[in-house]
Amino acid sequence: MTARKVTKELTITNKLGIHARPAALFVKTANQFECDIFVERGGETVNGKSIMGLMMLAAGPGSKLTLHTDGKDAARAAGELEDLVKHKFFEE
């Protein structure tokens, strides 16, 4: 049985942070999963399936984010989104 709720701490390491292209890639990946996905920064929580929500976090390089996934495919979603962030959104 896989976890229904997963929380991961992420650090933004790409040069420009989460701007339009990384936000779109994150949302495209997130929308492949049925689970709920939320991203938190500095006490503000946004829907991880919303480009505008992610961009409102103003997450620049070095920003610390908390990823919350909840649902039947939560573990897989969290893993794929963590890989995306770790690989700098494939920008570099």
Regions found by a protein language model. Name each.
Residues 2-5, 90-92:
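Short, charged helix-to-loop "capping" segments that act as catalytic/coupling loops
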Residues 6, 42, 76-77:
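Hydrophobic alpha-helical segments and their boundary regions
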Residues 11-52, 56-60:
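Compact, glycine-rich, soluble single-domain proteins
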Residues 60-92:
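C-terminal structural segments of small proteins and small subunits
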Residues 3-9, 64-66:
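Intrinsic-disorder/low-complexity, polar/charged segments enriched in Ser/Thr/Lys/Arg/Asp/Glu/Gln
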